[in-house]
From Swiss-Prot:
The active site is at E50 (proton acceptor), D61 (proton acceptor). Transmembrane segments: none annotated. This is Tryptophan synthase alpha chain. The alpha subunit is responsible for the aldol cleavage of indoleglycerol phosphate to indole and glyceraldehyde 3-phosphate. Keywords: Amino-acid biosynthesis, Aromatic amino acid biosynthesis, Lyase, Tryptophan biosynthesis. It comes from the Bacteria. NCBIfam families: trpA. It holds the Pfam family Trp_syntA. Gene3D superfamilies: Aldolase class I. It comes from Francisella tularensis subsp. mediasiatica (strain FSC147). SUPFAM superfamilies: Ribulose-phoshate binding barrel. Pathway: Amino-acid biosynthesis; L-tryptophan biosynthesis; L-tryptophan from chorismate: step 5/5. GO terms for cellular component: cytosol. It catalyses: (1S,2R)-1-C-(indol-3-yl)glycerol 3-phosphate + L-serine = D-glyceraldehyde 3-phosphate + L-tryptophan + H2O.
Length: 269
């Protein structure tokens, strides 16, 4: 089902826009509110969703997303609940690309093929396994291909040419380009320039590069698009809005709406 990404990027290109993709953890802060949050993100103008399934040991995540995982797990969320929420959001929004960003342990625990099939059945378009680099991804890649899900790879800013070439050849859907090395979070702002990496990815005809890590302000989205990225992903900044408004649902949803609208507006060239 990579067609949703292909269609999205083609439509955005026609309109001279970039993609704004928020990331949140499914089930944060609880099951009922999680669906409303996803619904708000899409209805406010998100071009695609990147979502986490709560896991007790999120290696690449900074404190903000780790806390989101803890909140979701403490509310009693299960992988089955996550798939229910995904199915519901897919039914409401048939065209939006939905990606999962998770860790290998979670996939192994469910059996790789079984997990990918469940994802497909719930309407998921892509899977990015944060702790599996492209050169170690064969068992996941093969099943992704068989099932019909796009396998996304991370392109680090300090990647060698051969790594970038491999990511370009093996990936599908989009390429997750890191704006810097380290763990996620807005504590450390994204540091451009990534023009050189973007030029290489273009040369190798990689899936569309989307910039992530430390993206929290509209001007960073603007910079990313200007540098040649097809879009920007914002995780910690989105999750922080949830964290800061746990006891005030309406304020949370209002702030998420404002944030998405502002970030999306920055993708318009």
């Amino acid at each position: 089902m990579t067609n949703r990404y292909t269609t999205l990027f083609a439509n955005l290109e026609k309109r001279n826009e970039g993609a704004f993709i928020p990331f949140v953890t499914i089930g944060d802060p609880n099951k009922a509110l999680s669906f409303e949050i996803l619904d708000t993100l899409v209805s406010s103008g998100a071009d695609a969703l990147e979502l986490g399934i709560p896991f007790s040991d999120p290696l690449a995540d900074g404190p903000t997303i780790q806390e989101a995982n803890i909140r979701a797990l403490e509310s009693g969320i299960t992988p089955k609940d996550c798939f229910d929420i995904l199915t519901k959001i897919r039914a409401k929004y048939p065209h939006i690309p939905i990606g999962l960003l998770l860790y290998a342990n979670l996939v192994y625990a469910n059996g790789i093929e079984n997990f990918y099939q469940k994802c497909l059945d719930a309407g998921v378009d892509s899977i990015l396994i944060a702790d599996v680099p492209a050169h170690e991804s064969k068992e996941f890649r093969d099943i992704a291909k068989k099932v019909g899900i796009a396998q996304i790879f991370i392109a680090p800013p300090d990647a060698s040419e051969s790594t970038l070439k491999q990511i370009s050849e093996l990936g599908s859907g989009y390429t997750y380009l890191l704006s810097r090395v380290g763990v996620t979070g807005t504590e450390t702002a994204a540091n451009m320039p990534v023009e050189d990496v973007l030029a290489k990815l273009r040369e190798y005809n990689a899936p569309k590069p989307v910039l992530g890590f430390g993206i929290s302000k509209p001007e960073q989205v603007q910079q990313a698009i200007k540098a040649g990225a097809a879009g920007a992903i914002s995780g910690s900044a989105t999750v922080k809005i949830i964290q800061n408004n746990i006891s005030n649902k309406q304020k949370m949803l209002n702030e998420l709406t404002y944030f998405v609208k502002e970030m999306k507006a920055a993708t318009l060239n």
